[in-house]
Amino acid sequence: MSKAPSVVLAGGGTAGHINPMLAIAREIRRIEPEANILTLGTKDKMEAQLVPEAGFDIEFIPRVAFPRSLSLNALTFFPRFAKAISQTRKILKDANADVVVGVGGYVCPPAYLAAFFSRIPVVIHEANAKPGLANKLGGPLAKFVGVAFSNTPFPRAKLVGMPMKDEIAHLNRRAARAQARHTLGLDPDKPVLIVTGGSLGAQSLNNAVAENITNFKDWGFQVLHITGKGKAIVDDSGEPVTAPNYRQIEFSHGMQDVYAAADLLIVRAGAATVSEVAAVGVPAIFVPLPFGNGEQSLNARSLVMAEAALLIEDKKMTGAWFAREIPSLMADAQKLKEMGRRAYKLGIRDAAHAMAEATLKVVK
């Protein structure tokens, strides 16, 4: 490579797009320390904070959503979209971009087309088992497409896994368990069930846990309940509920601690979560979102079919189901161990490296 490569990464809107993008960026920087790395995002989404915090530059382009019905927005879509493409072409020119890497989200369609019109190669990573619209549109333009799941229907795609933080990809759960439980305020010697619906929480999970709080003292294990911001379970006086063998927090800053501490995890089935569960080998029960296009159930399919995880529909995640199923599963240490072993066997831990190498190969 005669000069330091200039890489522009596009993605954002949700952590499911931002975290893989940052993992790829970090690995490119590790392989090519002199690489010029720029990201594209929108001002009003979380990438505006998370990308600079991670040490990368970001340029903003307008958020132009594809119209799904006839409206004023639909009538003005094409001029707004054309403007976003034009602005992105200028950014790519100013950055002397050698390649554009897209991970999905609103910024990707104008980025893909700007790259195409500027004769800059495109690399794509698709996180979900059911591809998003942005990446489906960009796929025919891409020199390389990496996917996180083997059942992703994407032409010419290569299975690479989900780019993730090194702290998670290379987590040794057994070695980290005691410290992780201490960090999370848990008894290091008692089995741990962790229930989390992510940063925003999940009502079905929160309700199922809340209905069983008084039972936990008799079940022989402790429960860490990550409720989501503003979703604490409160008593009649408005104070967060406390009970034997039960601890609740609104969020955790380090999912690696959650994965290390848990003997069993009850969680949504986002692409990153499913991939991380497999990478670290933690037994899990997935409760897919009850809306959307069904991608969360598809994300979890390979682990569930391999008996590495369980899946329950959101509407069936009730307090009664929880009380009927969870105590016996938590008491079956051998089954949990086997679930974790099978999950780990399916995990892919070098996705960031695979995507970084594919990106730099396109530049050469």
Describe every region a protein language model picked out.
Residues 4-12, 34-80, 85, 313-315:
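Conserved nucleotide-sugar phosphate-binding/catalytic loop shared by glycosyltransferases and other
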Residues 17-28:
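Short amphipathic alpha-helix
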Residues 118, 260-262, 278-287, 306:
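Conserved donor-binding/catalytic loop of nucleotide-activated donor transferases
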Residues 335-349:
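A short, well-ordered alpha-helix in the C-terminal region of glycosyltransferases
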Residues 87-100, 108-123, 136-141:
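Glycosyltransferases and closely related glycan-assembly transferases
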Residues 57, 116-178, 183:
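Active-site-proximal region of nucleotide-activated glycan assembly enzymes
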Residues 348-364:
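C-terminal alpha-helical cap of glycosyltransferases
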Residues 45-46, 50, 54, 176-267, ...:
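Donor-nucleotide binding loops and adjacent catalytic segments primarily
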